[in-house]
Structures are given as C-alpha cells and as structure tokens.
C-alpha cells in the first residue's frame, strides 16, 4: 500500500514489506519469461443475508497481499518439488500435462473468430504460445470468454508420484504442500 498514513503506521515493517514486494515482482517476472499462463480472472463473490439467502453477486478483486503470498507459495512449491525429485525418493507431485492436441485445435479455431491467428496445429505447444494469446486480449471485451475457453481446453491438474511437470506454470517441478489463500 502506498498510502503515506498506512506506511507511517506500520513503519517498522514497511522496509521488509517493500523488499518482499520487490522479490515477489521478480518471481512473477521470472515465471512470465519462462511462459507461465496467468489466469488472473476476477471471481464472483456471493453475498448472503443473516438467513444465508443470497442477496448479491459482486466481483472479488485480488489484492496485492494475496498476489505477494501466492508468488512465494508458488516458489516454495517448486523448490520443494525440485528438491525431492533430486533426492530420488518417493514423492507426490502436482502435475499438469500439456493439453490434448484436439482440444487445442478446437480452441485455436474458436479464437480465430476474434481475429487471432495462431501458428501451429496444437501439437507439442509451449505454454508461452497461450500466454501470448492472454496478453493480446488483455483488457479487451473478449478477454473473459477467451480465457475461459483456454482454461477449458487444458487438462486438469492432478497428483502423481511421477514428476511430469506443470504445463500451465511452465514449471519442470511442482507440488502442492502450501494451503490455499482463500
């Protein structure tokens, strides 16, 4: 938070939080460079009254603190997975395999309706190709539908005792030992 009053109130920890923010941004940039697909889509938040009856649906925005924690969690999950892989001991990985080529071809056909042209057939694709599509439609009216259809073209992540990497994160090693933020 760049609010002067807030920074002054927490002046003892502000330098540490500034360093954490800088490190988090470096980790985000590193993941982007290697091709991570970022599905940072606003989520729906259902508001309920005292009786538990829904009264409204609002967009839930992710804050900087949540992004910072997520960045460190991803780094921790990757580091632990790589460590155990190198130890060659039994371990459970969170794997996300490359999308099936037929699903990707369908997605590529779909996005051509929005004027996007993708080179290739969907065989042996790198995550950065999909990342570039995300970047092209960022802020456009069709961003939500294209991101949703891209997500649906992917395989589901799962747990496995064999390290198969994580396609969406463009990570060679990944596990899931941290708890969800939400």
Task: Give residue spans per PLM region.
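Electropositive polyanion-binding surfaces
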Residues: 1-182
